[in-house]
């Protein structure tokens, strides 16, 4: 059964409302439980309704819809769990890490004596720990359950110190936290480019500043309940950033992340 579940979880990550229904109609005939790899932005939307995230961000709205559709299929003979996953560190052989975009962003400030970045923080875990909670959810979760997942919580300042160390620039880089309005000003060019190209971003550009200013932390007790064990998050961040830097520098060529 686990092989079917793993196949299902890999596909479900890249689909939203309508396709989700078709997948569940098919999968429910084959297995007794399903694990959906969701997003911790859904957790934030439920924890902070005052931020009105589903109104502002199509991506977050689609994740909430995905949970709703998934749970509609749960019954006495079919368990559905959604893992609300945060940022994941570690490498996947042959794949380009999503953190290349971070290198592109902070590289522009390398010549400055400091880096300006939002003042919030994020939950995170390693690739291995994701595998552990997937197996745990498949074996232990009952009914319709959303699991907010995290094993570590770092402020952006703490995280960037590790990033700069991984880039060979030491851990004493000065990080200046900026207010959301300043980040919105900095993203003005991106917003203009999207408007000119007719692009609707899954995460609203203006609203992103408010999300980045939040300490989006999650207790580790949920991940541990599903069987996650301790790992070296600093080493995992190092691995992700080193590969991302190599991709940025053009010294390696890897496949981009995509839905399959």
Describe the role of every protein-language-model region.
Residues 2, 7, 18-62, 81:
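Conserved Rossmann-fold NAD(P)-dependent oxidoreductase catalytic core, especially the SDR/UDP-sugar
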Residues 130, 134, 149, 159, ...:
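Non-catalytic, hydrophobic alpha-helical segments
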Residues 121-128, 147-166, 180-185:
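Substrate-binding strand-loop-helix patch
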Residues 138-142, 167, 244-251:
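Short, hydrophobic alpha-helical segments
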Residues 213-260:
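Amphipathic terminal alpha-helices
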Residues 50-146, 150-152:
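Oxidoreductase cofactor-interface core, primarily capturing Rossmann-like NAD(P)-dependent enzymes
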Residues 160-216:
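Terminal hydrophobic/aromatic helix or amphipathic segment near a protein terminus
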Residues 45-47, 92-94, 159:
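Short glycine-/acidic-enriched loop or helix-start segments at secondary-structure transitions
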């Amino acid at each position: 059964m686990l092989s079917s579940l793993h196949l299902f979880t890999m596909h479900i990550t890249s689909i939203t409302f309508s396709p989700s229904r078709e997948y569940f109609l098919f999968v429910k005939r084959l297995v007794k439980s399903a694990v959906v790899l969701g997003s911790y932005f859904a957790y934030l939307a439920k924890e902070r309704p005052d931020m009105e995230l589903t109104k502002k961000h199509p991506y977050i709205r689609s994740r909430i819809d995905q949970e709703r559709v998934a749970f509609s299929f749960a019954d006495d003979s079919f368990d559905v769990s959604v893992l609300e996953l945060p940022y994941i560190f570690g490498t996947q052989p042959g794949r380009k890490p999503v953190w290349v975009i971070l290198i592109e962003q902070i590289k522009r400030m390398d010549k400055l004596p400091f880096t300006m970045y939002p003042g919030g923080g994020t939950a995170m875990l390693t690739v291995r720990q994701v595998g552990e909670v997937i197996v745990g959810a498949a074996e232990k979760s009952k009914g319709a359950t959303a699991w907010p997942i995290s094993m570590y919580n770092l402020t952006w300042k703490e995280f960037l110190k590790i990033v700069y160390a991984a880039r060979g620039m030491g851990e004493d880089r000065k990080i200046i936290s900026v207010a959301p309005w300043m980040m919105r000003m900095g993203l003005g060019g991106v917003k203009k480019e999207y408007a000119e190209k007719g692009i609707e971003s899954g995460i609203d550009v203006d609203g992103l500043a408010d999300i980045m200013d939040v300490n989006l932390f999650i207790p580790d007790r949920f991940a541990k309940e599903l069987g996650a064990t301790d790992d070296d998050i600093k080493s995992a961040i190092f691995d992700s950033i080193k590969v991302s830097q190599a991709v940025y520098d053009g010294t390696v060529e890897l496949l981009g992340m995509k839905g399959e």
